[in-house]
């Protein structure tokens, strides 16, 4: 009987809280019915799907927040790799899970809503897409830089300065940026 109850609890937790990744930039909302976006979730960032209601999902997003920048939740506690960014007028509920050292980089969680499409469980596939777009588009004018040639904070401005001379579509730019940042010299998720 004990095994049956534990199995049922495990199954419920797995089905009720699926870990997924955004495939592209997604608008986020304060509740299930709001039509006004309060921010954006960037691609390749993990979310826990808590509930589905109609065409919306309720998401838990964990990350790090610099208390000096209250409208951004970052992927890591040392680099500006954005997970979700809120508008300056938004007032999202952000729960501190663990206080950071010296008043910086608190581990946080926020609950937001988004359209239920555009999520995948295949993070490797998203990184492969970013890598392919980078390799096929960014080595045409110059030698291709290794992803570890720059740190996470440098990649967004470098790519944005050259992206207009590539075939990378606007909707894929953040997939490439997040791939580069998460495989940079200081973050490099493959080495963790």
Go through each PLM region and give its residues:
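Electrostatic cytochrome c docking/interface patches
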Residues: 107-131
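Gly/Gly-Pro-rich "capping" loops immediately C-terminal to redox-active cysteine motifs
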Residues: 143-166
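The canonical Cys-X-X-Cys-His
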Residues: 134-145, 176, 180
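Sec-dependent N-terminal signal peptides
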Residues: 4-13
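Beta-loop motif signature
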Residues: 19-49, 53-54, 117
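C-terminal capping alpha-helices of c-type cytochrome domains
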Residues: 166-192
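SH3/SH3-like beta-barrel superfamily modules
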Residues: 39-114
